[in-house]
């Protein structure tokens, strides 16, 4: 199903509204097909944060905080530690769109 630019912008706003209350989050980055496709299958979201909680705990926390968006379009949420080591996924994320920065 095609998604208009206005709908994409609305989803991005809702995502930020759902996550911005978490004090450990410093940046939210959208990357992947959501940025370039008219009919993306999902939204890839990198969340740069400084928490010491385990990856899975953070991923589940952020999924709960973004349920309203996930009901409209599936989300792939990737919590990243501030200053994460170089890896393949960071290349894709570096080409993404920062939608929130503290």
Regions found by a protein language model. Give the residues of each.
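Catalytic core of pol beta-like nucleotidyltransferases
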Residues: 1-29, 35-40, 50-102
